[in-house]
A protein has these predicted regions:
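Flexible, low-complexity junctional segments that flank or bridge functional domains
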Residues: 32-401, 406-408, 413-416, 424, ...
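Bacterial N-terminal signal peptides that target proteins for export
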Residues: 2-15
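Conserved acidic, small-residue-rich alpha-beta core segments centered on
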Residues: 306, 312-315, 394, 399-401, ...
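Sec-dependent N-terminal signal peptides of Gram-positive bacterial secreted proteins and lipoproteins
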Residues: 15-23
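Extracytoplasmic/peripheral linker and loop segments enriched in polar/acidic and small residues
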Residues: 94-104, 300, 306-307, 548-582
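C-terminal motif of bacterial Sec signal peptides marking the signal peptidase cleavage site
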Residues: 26-30
Length: 582
């Protein structure tokens, strides 16, 4: 079993902010409007439309012209309108002749055109305001090869990056490690830490590197586990094994050994499912769902997982038992305890599938094993709720520090798993504008985004400090705007945030703007469908949230000391938050 607060590992961040109308009260245009610009519909483009670099640029420009939501604001950062971009760059792309990269051109000519095309696209995209936006473009490199290049805006230089996993040990040492703290870095890079500060009793620190709370810190457990029913069609016991062995194995000696091995494997499974370890884990998992005492959930689930038969740990986790018999047979191949049984192929085939059917259909093993393994791999399922949300609800957390530094965003549903407890009044936290139709400068009015009080609200304002850096993006920024809408008890500290609050959807028919997906095999767009302003009307895209307490950028030496947990290291952001909340 792992030691919760001491886990250290890698991280992966930057998930996009996805729209959830149930949370924000936003409305979406129900369908894409007719193309008033009389251009070809985006979905109608195909590879036959791209025969040259000029064609490639034409398709790129047309998609942006129809779907990009921020052309009107581009004038603030560029001396060119979008039409002027076309007039300057269309002739440049037309002058590149080697898109077909045939033997009519030398390799050097192909690669020179490749370099120019990349330069031109980067010059255009450098001025893009939207910080979620990127485009992948496939270009010829030689007579027989292509490359796909990702182009992002470099409009704003982002330097302040302070991810939680890098300063994990230093921050952990600021917390009371008396059983009230929790922390974890999961195998897929989710990183979270929470606990009371040693120097400031009642002040709680919570930091995480991406908004993936729902998938890591919550789980819907069953109301009960591991039923048994001897009358089930799928019931398996020693007598059935004996009967089938007599039917399928003629050699008495081989039959006896095969029967013994099969019966022993079944007994091992039954003994485990009836064990105290499994029972205690089941009790805590059901208690989590039934609002009972689930303390010790992680420890007991880990114990039950670790003592489980090795075969269970080798099998794929799936609800479908079809073909599971073959999976069992394959996993047993290397185990000397079952070779006599496996050598009787007809019996082995029957037995392995019968065992799978019994475990999956009568004992409902999938539900138990899936939930047990999830808990084993996510100690924060217990920690986030028992050591953060419950003390918060009880009023034990008097002040709160939220560390969003290095947090690139994630799922919008996570807002409800944090902010719902801290919202005490309905408030407008932002304004959103979308495309009204496919004309480049046709927009909806600015639509107010409201956060409302839910039944989870604590009904009291908790002094809160939010730590930000240049890589606090997307949902980190939206969550900050939501909490800031609640009043002056919420303060922000650090550097300007990333500046990426626009909304994304994978449904390209849901709105008149934005596009996620390919347009021909040469172009892949990742384009938001909206633009966001804060409650005061400030455009934050590419600018970011300016903190209430703007700190000087951390030096390389400062960061290195914090990363190495040097005795002289000082986290100025955390220190400032503690001063403000004192």
């Amino acid at each position: 079993m792992r030691t919760p607060i001491y886990i250290k590992g890698g991280m992966r961040c930057f998930f996009a902010f996805l729209l959830a109308t149930t949370t924000t009260g936003m409305s979406l245009t129900s369908c894409v409007a007719d193309n008033d610009a009389n251009e070809k519909s985006i979905s109608d483009y195909s590879d036959t439309d791209v025969k040259s670099y000029g064609d490639l640029f034409q398709v790129f420009w047309s998609v942006m012209n129809q779907r990009y939501c921020t052309l009107n604001e581009q004038s603030a950062v560029s001396s060119q309108t979008w039409d002027q971009v076309y007039k300057e760059y269309k002739p440049k792309f037309d002058a590149l002749k080697t898109f077909q990269h045939t033997s009519a051109f030398t390799q050097q000519e192909i690669q020179e055109d490749n370099a120019k095309a990349k330069q031109y696209f980067q010059e255009i995209i450098d001025k893009i305001i939207d910080q979620h936006f990127y485009v992948k473009i496939t270009l010829p490199v030689s007579h027989s090869s292509m490359e796909t290049v990702r182009f992002n805006s470099t409009l704003r230089n982002k330097t302040e990056y302070f991810p939680l996993n890098a300063h994990w040990n230093h921050t952990r040492d600021q917390l009371n490690l008396d059983g009230t703290a929790f922390g974890e870095i999961t195998s897929d890079g989710f990183c979270i830490m929470g606990g009371y500060l040693k120097e400031q009793p009642g002040t709680y620190y919570l930091g995480f590197n991406k908004f993936a709370l729902y998938e890591n810190c919550f789980h819907e457990y069953q109301k009960s586990y591991l039923p048994g029913n001897a009358a089930s069609t799928y019931h398996l016991d020693a007598s059935k094994i004996t009967d089938k062995a007599k039917e399928l194995i003629t050699d008495a000696g081989k039959r006896e050994k095969a029967e013994q091995q099969a019966a022993q494997l079944l007994a091992d499974m039954d003994n485990y499912l009836a064990s105290d370890d499994a029972a205690k884990a089941c009790e805590k998992m059901t208690a989590y769902s039934n609002q009972g005492d689930y303390s010790g959930l992680y420890a007991l689930a880990s114990q039950a997982y670790e003592v489980a038969p090795g075969l269970l740990k080798l099998l794929p986790i799936t609800a479908d038992a079809s073909g599971m018999g073959e999976q069992i047979r394959q996993k047993l191949q290397g185990d000397t305890r079952y070779q006599q049984m496996l050598s009787a192929s007809s019996f082995a085939n029957w037995y392995c599938q019968a065992l799978a059917d019994y475990l999956w259909h009568e004992r409902e093993l999938y539900a138990y094993w899936n939930d047990l393994k999830f808990t084993y791999n996510h100690l924060c399922v217990e920690g986030y709720r028992r050591l953060f949300l419950e003390p918060l609800a009880k009023g034990e957390i008097k002040k709160l520090i939220l560390d969003f530094r290095g947090n690139g965003g994630g799922s919008v549903i996570d807002t409800r798993l944090l902010t719902d407890y801290l919202i005490t009044q309905t408030a407008v936290y932002a304004y959103v504008r979308k495309k009204e139709d496919n004309n480049p400068y046709s927009y909806t009015p600015w639509i107010p985004q409201k956060i409302t009080v839910t039944s989870k609200s604590l009904g009291r304002n908790i002094p809160t400090a939010i730590l930000l850096d240049n890589y606090s993006a997307s949902m980190s920024e939206v969550t900050t705007l939501i909490l800031k809408s609640q009043g002056d008890h919420v303060k922000t500290i650090g550097r300007n945030s990333y500046g990426a609050q626009a909304m994304l959807t994978s449904d390209n028919e849901a709105s008149n703007g934005g596009w996620i997906g390919n347009v021909t095999s040469y172009l892949y767009f990742y384009m938001p469908f909206s633009l966001t302003k804060d409650a005061q009307g400030n455009l934050l895209e590419s600018v970011g949230i300016t903190t209430d307490y703007l700190l000087d950028e951390m030096t390389g030496e400062e960061k290195e000391k914090l990363y190495q947990n040097d005795a002289s290291a000082v986290d100025r952001g955390l220190k400032k938050a503690m001063e403000i909340l004192k």
